[in-house]
Design a protein with these regions (language model features):
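Class I SAM-dependent methyltransferase Rossmann-like catalytic core
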Residues: 47-61
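A short acidic, Gly/Pro-enriched loop at the edge of an enzyme's catalytic core
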Residues: 133-141
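Conserved SAM-binding loop of SAM-dependent methyltransferases across substrates and taxa
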Residues: 85-96
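Conserved alpha-helix/loop element of class I SAM-dependent methyltransferases that forms part
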Residues: 57-75
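Class I SAM-dependent methyltransferase SAM/SAH-binding core
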Residues: 95-130
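N-terminal auxiliary segments of SAM/dcSAM-dependent transferases
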Residues: 1-37
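A short SAM/SAH-binding and catalytic strip from SAM-dependent methyltransferases
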Residues: 140-153
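Conserved class I S-adenosyl-L-methionine
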Residues: 75-84
């Protein structure tokens, strides 16, 4: 099963029907915010007046610094394991031709899709990475910030 949020494909073929991880009610607020913003500029404007750590952690473009400096080959594909709410997914979409993001949580994947809805090169697979069958080969693989969730795998 799949659905599209604007241009982003959400793939539920490997989703168990239960989110394996959640930060709780704050994720509902994050989803509401990304559903109501027009673009990244709106999100940045929201952050100017916000001091709550959770919003800054999930939405600040400062997190792009971790790989913004890297010279990716444009005609490449990237697998992002543990994409969460899409903190750096958009950066990957700008850098390479195809991004496949994987996350345990349907809600976090939905936040990611709304946040990055302008990209037409993004597919998000919802499910446990150990259960997902991927035959595609990738030029790059990212596992940023997933160690803390290793107990869920």
């Amino acid at each position: 099963m799949e659905e599209y949020i604007n241009k982003v494909k959400l793939n539920y073929d490997f989703y168990s029907g239960k989110d394996e991880y959640s930060d709780g009610d704050i994720e509902d607020k994050l989803l509401e915010i990304v559903k109501n913003i027009k673009d990244e500029e709106d999100l940045e404007e929201f952050l100017v007046n916000e001091s709550e750590w959770t919003y800054l952690y999930h939405f600040s473009k400062i997190r792009h610094n971790i790989l913004d400096w890297y010279k990716f080959e444009k005609k490449a594909s990237l697998l992002e394991i543990g994409a969460g709410c899409g903190a750096i997914t958009g950066l990957f979409c700008e850098k390479v031709d195809r991004v496949v993001a994987v996350d345990l949580s349907k809600k976090r994947s939905t936040i990611n899709a709304y946040r990055n809805k302008k990209y037409d090169n993004l597919e998000i697979i919802v499910g446990n990475f150990e259960d997902i069958k991927i035959s595609e080969k990738f030029d790059y693989i990212s596992l940023i910030g997933v160690l803390e969730y290793s107990l869920y795998y």
